[in-house]
């Protein structure tokens, strides 16, 4: 995600298989793998859900499958700790992808590298059915880990010209281990799987560096959903900030789009003692920053969906007594409606252009769309609710959730096929 969620230090966990029953109005069935993590400091249980959706799954799974899933627990713990101790940044997940690819091939799952460091695995079940994709992100963040865990990350690397630590601070190590465990379980019950399961181990969810391509857009561009053609896509994310033991969902728009913008204001350099001889781009920039917020508060219909415009960086000048020629600011735009996203772009461009003109300056705006709105297909959500409720242990643990203004590039999969993100 395009914001960092720091997770509690996690230790051992167990794995359970929850049987699902066919809902009256749907053939959709869901195999749910529930991961119980126990946090070391608080000794509390963190319930993490990975959804493995299958159509027309038999109503009564043999008890032996419960034993099969439980037997995988030590491996999943080991994998999670390995990836936590050996994190790699976006588009640099070379060893991570090699390990994933090799293991999928050991299981007899067709596997190939996609998007440079991503892995796509294909498991063809023994029964006819649709093609269901399951996605886990695999990249880490430039964050230094500070704790005493035996499997803490001591990895360092160069990032933007600085030496930084590398850490799975957003839980992607857990996502990898959970999907690898799911792949092993399904490979061992292959004859009972109706349809085809596509495992998407995606790099660069946190964003590819610089001008590089990566993440879900590149996975889609290189055909990760096309061969075979995927019918539905499921994704999830662990979240330490939510109540334990609950599954959170929302039909329709769920997570925000994310656009990154750069505004360059060109003025006229002069001495600070003679400001009337120049055009101050810093003053112009301050006016622009203030007026960007009136786009949100006075120009957008916030009863439709939230809009957030944030300026997070501004650079100008080299000396305190010289008015510089140029000021550059950077920021982000968050929206939960595709139409509003386009409207905000237009209003930003008009606002910047007109304010600059008032002061005799010029300004250039560039906007780069990083993610789309993450949209949960309402019909697919409705079909999945009975199974999710079963997995959660009752309706009180299945929680309708609100909009999330964080962003996820999972949204690009939903642009190609019906999708759900929990």
Give the ranges of each region predicted by the language model.
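Bacterial Sec-dependent N-terminal signal peptides
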Residues: 1-4, 8-63
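Extracytoplasmic/secreted proteins, especially bacterial periplasmic and envelope-associated proteins
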Residues: 64, 71, 75-78, 82, ...
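Divalent metal-coordination and catalytic microenvironments
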Residues: 83, 121, 134, 172, ...
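Soluble non-cytosolic domains of exported or imported proteins
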Residues: 70-74, 87-98, 169, 173, ...
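Histidine/acidic-residue-rich, glycine-tolerant segments that coordinate divalent metal ions
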Residues: 156-167, 173-174, 185-186, 191-304, ...
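Acidic/His- and Gly-rich active-site-bordering loop/insert found
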Residues: 59-167, 177-194
């Amino acid at each position: 995600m395009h914001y960092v969620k720091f997770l509690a230090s996690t230790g051992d966990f167990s794995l359970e298989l929850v049987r699902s029953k066919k809902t009256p109005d749907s053939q959709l069935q869901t195999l749910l793998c529930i991961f119980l993590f126990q946090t070391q400091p608080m000794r509390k249980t963190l319930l993490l859900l990975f959804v493995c959706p299958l159509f027309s799954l038999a109503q009564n799974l043999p008890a032996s499958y419960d034993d099969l899933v439980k037997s995988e627990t030590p491996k999943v713990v080991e994998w999670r700790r390995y990836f936590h101790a050996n994190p790699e940044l976006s588009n640099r997940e070379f060893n991570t992808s090699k390990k994933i690819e090799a293991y999928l091939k050991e299981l007899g799952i067709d596997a190939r590298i996609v998007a440079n460091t991503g892995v796509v695995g294909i498991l063809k079940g023994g029964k006819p059915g649709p093609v269901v994709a399951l996605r886990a992100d695999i990249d880490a963040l430039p964050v230094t880990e500070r704790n005493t865990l035996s499997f803490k990350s001591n990895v360092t690397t160069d990032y933007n010209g600085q030496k930084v630590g590398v850490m799975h601070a957003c839980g992607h190590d857990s996502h990898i281990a959970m999907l690898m465990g799911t792949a092993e379980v399904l490979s061992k019950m292959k004859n009972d799987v109706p349809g085809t399961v596509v495992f998407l181990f995606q790099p660069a969810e946190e964003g590819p560096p610089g001008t590089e391509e990566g993440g879900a857009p590149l996975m889609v561009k290189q055909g990760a959903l096309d061969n075979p053609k995927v019918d539905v896509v499921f994704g999830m994310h662990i979240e330490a900030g939510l109540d334990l033991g609950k599954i959170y969902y929302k039909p329709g728009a769920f997570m925000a789009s994310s656009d990154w913008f750069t505004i360059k204001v060109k003025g006229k350099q002069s001495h600070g003692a003679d400001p009337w001889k120049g055009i101050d781009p810093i003053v112009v920039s301050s006016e622009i920053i203030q007026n960007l917020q009136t786009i949100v508060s006075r120009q957008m219909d916030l009863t439709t969906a939230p809009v957030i415009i944030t300026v997070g960086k501004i650079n100008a000048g080299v000396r305190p007594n010289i008015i510089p020629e140029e000021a550059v600011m950077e920021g982000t735009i968050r929206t939960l409606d595709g139409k509003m996203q386009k409207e905000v772009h237009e209003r930003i461009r008009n606002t910047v252009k007109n304010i600059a003109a008032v002061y005799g300056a010029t300004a250039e705006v560039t906007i780069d769309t990083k993610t789309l709105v993450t949209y949960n297909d309402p019909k697919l959500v409705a079909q999945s609710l009975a199974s999710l409720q079963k997995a959660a242990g009752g309706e009180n643990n299945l929680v309708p959730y609100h909009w999330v203004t964080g962003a996820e590039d999972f949204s690009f999969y939903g642009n190609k096929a019906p999708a759900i993100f929990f």
